[in-house]
Amino acid sequence: MGYKEGSAKKGATLFKTRCAQCHTTEAGGPHKVGPNLHGVINRHSGEAEGYSYSDANKRKGIEWTTEHLFEYLENPKKYIPGTKMAFGGLKKPKDRNDLITWMVENC
């Protein structure tokens, strides 16, 4: 099972409660513990300008499509061993779909 469009409204709540403490999304916004996510959809892994990524993220060599994000957000450390991301993941496919739908519209 892969990405299916979800609820952007529910995704906004998930972003605020699970992601915003480490990430910003506005154009030109600062990096925090994690990189600014503006423009992340279809960007290559490890390429947000000015952010210090782990070698693992740089080497992953993927484009952040909705499908890759769906897999990654389930278990970031399994998808990219060596990532600095300390987030344990969203186990429910519905939550990942909602968050990614919001990201497509807002990042």
From Swiss-Prot:
Compartmental location: Mitochondrion intermembrane space
Residues engaged in binding heme c: C19, C22, H23, M85
Any one Gene Ontology cellular component term annotated for this protein: mitochondrial intermembrane space
Keywords: Electron transport, Heme, Iron, Metal-binding, Methylation, Mitochondrion, Respiratory chain, Transport
Pfam families: Cytochrom_C
Listed GO MF terms: electron transfer activity; heme binding; metal ion binding
Residues where N6,N6,N6-trimethyllysine is found: K77
Domain of life: Eukaryota
Metal-binding listed as a keyword: yes
Post-translational note: Binds 1 heme c group covalently per subunit.
One biological process term in Gene Ontology: mitochondrial electron transport, ubiquinol to cytochrome c
Family: Belongs to the cytochrome c family.
PANTHER family: CYTOCHROME C
UniProt function note: Electron carrier protein. The oxidized form of the cytochrome c heme group can accept an electron from the heme group of the cytochrome c1 subunit of cytochrome reductase. Cytochrome c then transfers this electron to the cytochrome oxidase complex, the final protein carrier in the mitochondrial electron-transport chain.
Protein name, as recorded: Cytochrome c
Organism field: Yarrowia lipolytica (strain CLIB 122 / E 150)
Taxon lineage: Eukaryota, Fungi, Dikarya, Ascomycota, Saccharomycotina
